[in-house]
């Protein structure tokens, strides 16, 4: 007997959903740049099969409530987080909220494509301010997954 996996994935929209250009911009389905949409779509398409159901959660969620974690635990088998340049100054508050959420879920968490963003000539010591946030995020994920995709 084949069982169906129910997956919750961070992303702007399902690649199966038909939306207009105006809806895409108005609802920020790009996640502020088209690379986010392309990356999330590729993860979705890789996982999509007759044995998976994938719900796309959007980008604007505030992931840190106990109720949200309880709902995820009750309804899903896996949480997929396609990230690109999440280790950057303006994303750290959201990364910290994801850490809180991940610490509350009991299902496997898969992170793909995460990395740091900095200017080509920047002093990497300028990234030290986020070390604690990045470390806590990675610890939370690795308690629920064997690895983190970079």
For each of these PLM feature ranges, what is it?
Residues 1-147:
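Aromatic- and Gly/Pro-rich donor/ligand-binding loops
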Residues 150:
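Mid-sequence, gly/pro-rich, charge-dense loop/helix-turn segments that line enzyme active sites
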